[in-house]
């Protein structure tokens, strides 16, 4: 089994480059049980009203923070209980990122998608361990890699027996503390056969741009998301928060949840136009 599935189903949510757009959306990290439930409830209500499928995302450990003093999250043990309760309460599929082989095994029982962070996307043992859990795998493209380099990364998962894998574009290093989004990477990675996701919030990040933390340019999230959907992708990855300027991590990139519904509606309109055009000329 070495070919990826062109369509990946996560619960009731379908990710395919030719199917209607789906979302991966949630706060950067689990700040508390109450905050996780508040955000989850609001996101689900917005997505249900818009009529779009989504996977809820949140991190239990931000292991690659800029400085040692930065808030990393609540940790794996507490997160496992919260993820289980979120799924029981709301019924949606859940994504979280993993950093070690041991974490893959520990968290795979309560989440549906294991995400490989961009900085770790070439770590063979991590990819193989994630693949063997049977969860869907979402691999962030390293900021240091060309899009065609991701074909070998993809094969590490599929050749380990897991065809349910997605590739995620999140920007490319462009000098110091800057990322740019090369939209050519989306069709290039799509050509490998797997669904492609565009991370619209981390793509505007300024890594280490504030000295002891990362900055970001939130005002460009919508612009880049529209561009990616116009190219044609399976899904958009968005981080959101009720008060991003005071969030413990990635606040400069996250969109305010009050603006989420409007953005989703815009992206769905772009997606309908794009997919109709692609299907006409297929």
Curated annotation (Swiss-Prot):
- Its EC number is 2.5.1.55
Coiled-coil parts of chain: none
Q: Does the keyword Protease apply?
A: no
**Which pathway does this polypeptide act in?**
Carbohydrate biosynthesis; 3-deoxy-D-manno-octulosonate biosynthesis; 3-deoxy-D-manno-octulosonate from D-ribulose 5-phosphate: step 2/3; Bacterial outer membrane biogenesis; lipopolysaccharide biosynthesis
One GO cellular component term, please give it: cytoplasm
Its Gene Ontology molecular function terms? 3-deoxy-8-phosphooctulonate synthase activity
Cellular localization per UniProt: Cytoplasm
Keywords in alphabetical order, please.
Answer: Cytoplasm, Lipopolysaccharide biosynthesis, Transferase
What reactions does this protein catalyze?
A: D-arabinose 5-phosphate + phosphoenolpyruvate + H2O = 3-deoxy-alpha-D-manno-2-octulosonate-8-phosphate + phosphate
Is Cytoplasm set as a keyword in this record?
yes
For the protein in the UniProt heading, the enzyme class is transferase
Tell me the Gene Ontology biological-process terms attached to this UniProt entry.
Answer: keto-3-deoxy-D-manno-octulosonic acid biosynthetic process
InterPro entries annotated for this entry? Aldolase_TIM, DAHP1/KDSA, KDO8P_synthase
Q: What is its main location?
A: cytoplasm
Q: What HAMAP family does its record include?
A: KDO8P_synth (MF_00056)
State the family it belongs to: Belongs to the KdsA family.
Q: What PANTHER family would the database entry show?
A: PHOSPHO-2-DEHYDRO-3-DEOXYHEPTONATE ALDOLASE
- What is this protein's record name? 2-dehydro-3-deoxyphosphooctonate aldolase
Q: Which organism is this entry from?
A: Bartonella bacilliformis (strain ATCC 35685 / KC583 / Herrer 020/F12,63)
Q: What is the lineage of its organism?
A: Bacteria, Pseudomonadati, Pseudomonadota, Alphaproteobacteria, Hyphomicrobiales
